Swiss-Prot record:
Every ELMO domain range: 383-561
PROSITE patterns: ELMO
Pfam families linked: ELMO_CED12, FH3_FHOD1-3
Alphabetical list of InterPro entries matching this protein: ARM-like, ARM-type_fold, ELMO_dom, ELMO_domain-containing, FH3_FHOD1-3-like
Tree of life domain: Eukaryota
Any one cellular-component term (Gene Ontology): cytoplasm
Gene field: elmoA
Name listed for the protein in its UniProt record: ELMO domain-containing protein A
Gene3D superfamilies on file: 6.10.10.90, Leucine-rich Repeat Variant
UniProt organism field: Dictyostelium discoideum
Amino acid sequence: MKIKVTFQERIIEHNFETEITNLQQVTQKLCSLFLITNYYSYSLFLSSGQLVDNINLIDEGSEIIIKHLNRLGTISIGSGYSNSVVGTTNNNAPSSPSSSININGQQIQQQIQQQIQQQQQQQQQQQQQVQLSPDTLINNLLNNLKDNTFKKKAFFDLKDLKEEILIKKFVEKNGIEVIVCQLKELTGNTLSYALSALQTIMSYEFTITSMTSTDTASLITQLLPLTENTSNPSISKTSLSLLCLFLNQSNNLNFKQFSSTLVLEYNEKTKRNYNHTLVQLLSSSNTVDVQLNALTLINIIIGKTMSTTIPGLENGSVTGGENGFNKLLKELDEYEINQKLKKLVESIIVAPELKRQLYIYQRHRFQVITNRKNVTFNKESSEHDALLMKLWSLTYPGVKLESRVSEQWKQMGFQGTDPCTDFRAMGIWGLDNLIYFAQNYNEKFRKIVNSQIDRKEREYPTATAGIVLTFELYNSIFKMGTPNLNPYNSTTSNTTSNTTSTTNIDDLPFFPLFFSHPHAFEEVYCTTFQILDSTWDDMNGTYMHFQKIMSSVKNLIITALESKPTTLEAFDWKCQKNTKNSNGGTNSNQNNSSSNLLLSNFANGSSLLSLLNDLSSSSRDDMKKLLTGVNYQVLDLIKSQKISYFQEGFQFKLHKQLKTKQSLPLNWIFIRLFNNNNNNNNNNENCSYEIQYCFLSTELNQPPLPNQSIPTNYNTIKISDLFFNGESTNSNNKKKDKSLSYFNISIKDEQIQSLIQNQLPLSNLNNSSNSLQLDSSTSMNSIKDSIINISSSNNNIKDNLTNNNTNTNTNNTNNNTSNGNGNSNSVSMSSININNSGQLSPNTTSPILIPQQQQQQPQSSSLSVQHQQSSTPTPSSPVLLSSPSLQSSSSSSSSSSNPNLFTIDLISSNRDDVSNFWDSIKLLSGQEIKSQEGLDDYHSLLSINTSVKLLDLDGIDIPKETPQIPILPDNFDFRTV
């Protein structure tokens, strides 16, 4: 809720992100905006003068005035707010200042006493309401809900209703239907109170079961779009919470209805899937409660989908059961949910409940593996047989398998001639992991298999070892088979089991690593397999040592996961470090971690670029991969920031002004980036950007107009049509102000080219009959019906603007100039009129802007429009100038090498604007950053991110909270201590 607050002569706009329920807290908050500590000595008033004694008086857009109680008596009667605040005075009262003060002071005291009495009366009424029968109390509430005057107060009271008997009476009297029917009409705090009231009512299980299918469908249909309410996070949060309550307490039939409503209504209206909307809420919202409720709803939908069989629906609805479960998770992967959750995991502070929901989602992902593990290998299945043949062809390409049951399988490391007997423990999942390793790391997998021949009597069965690794990862390391930690093993319909809701989240096996890759388990499996093979040689293992070596590898993986790595790179780094430590520190020169090298070189003042070049030229693939990832993240962050600046727009001054045919100087250019998709999507890759610009006419020494006052009429060009040629290095201009930045750009725009090619000479412009002449006896009102003429030489300009959808209608006539007595013949050929207020009225959408003129007498006998504008001290809001001829003060503005480019020299006093503008164009064009400021930012961010990454990989914990500042010593004279 957004309100305007005034204290003395200061005005501040404040936005309440959460619902307000306590007047004292609101007063304290608003007083703190003006650094008022003794807020209890102040009161809030509306702009009408009414004292704010009820929180319901504050609504969206309210204007609040803060007044000191002791100073209200000094306000004279009849001024400002005294009539409303103090009341009407006696006409016979003395008029002296002292008596006026006393009268007002007494009235203030009386009004305060009246407020106390009103509060006491309200308390008595509440006590009386408690004594009323439930029927009477609920009837009063329902009547107030239907009355616009008391509706907001009724919702506010209803959300605090806690007695179960009253809730039952409210439901029996169709109270839910009364609320649902009004949701579409409610806004602001009233809507927030209504949703909170629904949340209170639906927290009782009997309310869900008592709802009809019509009420259920109507409620869900209205709640779904409310979850996207970004202007009021409280509405979005409560709507998501209501959907969670509904699904948690519903039976399977209602969930089918929910899914049907979700697919058939919301998706058709919005042309997108609601699951995608929920995933976007995980990243687009800055409110933790919204992110938490969105993830909770996702978990509930996943759990309900697994336990419910939903008939197939049209338009791509999700079916229930295991197939629907797998399909839903695959769909969430397509919406990049893992990237969103990874950012939540990497947050500075993760709330315990949010961490719990992250764990529950992780268990859902584990369930996919469990389902696959429970599939027994069937030798009669053609699908399973095809998977087995795929493993053979990946391991021995070009080698023909003699038969389905063959001794050749023992070469791969199976125990017998029929591999299906080895998959009993882990089902088809054991085969899936072997295929993943052989397919994605074929060379390494084949090397491990073929190396068993060289080991002779020291070999180990490769395929069998891989199946054992799958078993250990599933049961001992990731604990996927632990029943009491599985969210599905709950007697209730809630997807969060009783165990997970009571167990400390820090005691649960939570692995942030799984949010970094869609196949995180398989990637960990491949890494572990390679560690097993290298450890086998390091320990000179034999088949008799298999269990001992496997136990050592398992402990190594568990130790690496204890540090909670968030990426696979960090996990690999931890494993390598633990492997070297377990081997006794051999090859010490190679064991120095790159992070220690980098940090020590930083301490010695070495160059970042040289260090990064050394690391990137290293033969270690993990370092190259790490640096590539950090570099991509830094560039993506810089690009997002630069694009954000460009979307707000830049205003630059023209080094040499352009002039219109009417001699109006154009001194400024406003240019911005525009997202043509209009979908508020922060993903730059999915945006279709264009560049918009317009010229402004203000005083030469005046600053440009503020961004918010610029109209939305722009010329639009492609990104490829704008060129930043670089900063000016003209040595001839020795008087350049060093505090200013000089640069030039080139614009490829047919409309601008047409305007420039049809320009009139500047020398003929002032004496041309096309200028509207004014003398000392002419006022703006006397020429309000006059129209600026456009000469016949500009027909092609008009045609060009018409082709660009400006819809300019001009009929060229001859204009007779004024003879000095103020009499001029009006001409009806223009798209700019002078209205009754003496202001220019736009009828077109040209990118040329001039400020409105103020009514004032000209100082000379013959003044052009340009002269009158120059006498205006401060430019007011701009209006549009139609179909002007542009005149550059330098003929070199057009590039001689490319006649289609129009080059403009610009000046800026803000160096940051120039660098942000420059870098934005380069990054959007797929080029490298060129400005020195941009390069400095890039190097700084790259340095910080690389250092943090390496510190994390090296096991150095970085505190997430700012350390406390030590207490100052009592004695600073340390020599006497």
